[in-house]
Amino acid sequence: MEKFSVHRGVGVPMRRTDVDTDQIIPAVYLKRVTKTGFEDALFAGWRKDPGFVLNQEPYRPGSVLVAGQDFGTGSSREHAVWALRDYGFRAVLAPRFGDIFRGNAGKQGLLAAVVAQSDIDLIWKALEAHPGTEVTVDLIERIVQVDDFTAPFEVDDYVRWRLVEGLDDIGLTLRHADAITDFEARRPSFKPTTTPLAPSA
């Protein structure tokens, strides 16, 4: 997983509240068996509207999504995070997130930063006044900056550490590879084991 310390990218103002995971990625796209390639599925229902924000040229290369209250609510689907990540988003700013979405985001390298609604309103205005404006998200200092405006954001300490270190669940496990190898070497042979996969024909 790519490390995250400071990111600067085009901000995308999404003036919508209660955006659930089915709106982020419709269920029809969940049939895929891969973990990547979901960029076309992101907000698929809304992207049929020519006026949707991601259909506006200045916002298309966006990597910082600025959303309304209760982003990522609804069913638990990691695909919602994958779709945002595959499109190119590194951070989502919102006053509040769905708990499961927020947890999934941190494990997949996407920062879900909690920003006060009053600050979100000011960021929306700045991005709409000058489409294509870049937003700086500083995870080390926990601040977001747009032009001369700076606002703090909240993120769980553990999630912040994982993002800064670039550690997904596999990366965390591999940090203990030596201990795992040592344990397996000392483990009694009469205990159950898993059978290695047979080579494919």
From Swiss-Prot:
<dbReference type="InterPro" id="IPR033940">
    <property type="entry name" value="IPMI_Swivel"/>
</dbReference>
<comment type="function">
    <text>Catalyzes the isomerization between 2-isopropylmalate and 3-isopropylmalate, via the formation of 2-isopropylmaleate.</text>
</comment>
<dbReference type="Pfam" id="PF00694">
    <property type="entry name" value="Aconitase_C"/>
</dbReference>
<comment type="pathway">
    <text>Amino-acid biosynthesis; L-leucine biosynthesis; L-leucine from 3-methyl-2-oxobutanoate: step 2/4.</text>
</comment>
<dbReference type="GO" id="GO:0009098">
    <property type="term" value="P:L-leucine biosynthetic process"/>
</dbReference>
<keyword id="KW-0432">Leucine biosynthesis</keyword>
<keyword id="KW-0028">Amino-acid biosynthesis</keyword>
<keyword id="KW-0456">Lyase</keyword>
<comment type="similarity">
    <text>Belongs to the LeuD family. LeuD type 1 subfamily.</text>
</comment>
<protein>
    <recommendedName>
        <fullName>3-isopropylmalate dehydratase small subunit</fullName>
        <ecNumber>4.2.1.33</ecNumber>
    </recommendedName>
</protein>
<keyword id="KW-0100">Branched-chain amino acid biosynthesis</keyword>
<dbReference type="GO" id="GO:0003861">
    <property type="term" value="F:3-isopropylmalate dehydratase activity"/>
</dbReference>
<comment type="subunit">
    <text>Heterodimer of LeuC and LeuD.</text>
</comment>
<dbReference type="InterPro" id="IPR004431">
    <property type="entry name" value="3-IsopropMal_deHydase_ssu"/>
</dbReference>
<dbReference type="GO" id="GO:0009316">
    <property type="term" value="C:3-isopropylmalate dehydratase complex"/>
</dbReference>
<dbReference type="InterPro" id="IPR050075">
    <property type="entry name" value="LeuD"/>
</dbReference>
<dbReference type="InterPro" id="IPR015928">
    <property type="entry name" value="Aconitase/3IPM_dehydase_swvl"/>
</dbReference>
<dbReference type="InterPro" id="IPR000573">
    <property type="entry name" value="AconitaseA/IPMdHydase_ssu_swvl"/>
</dbReference>
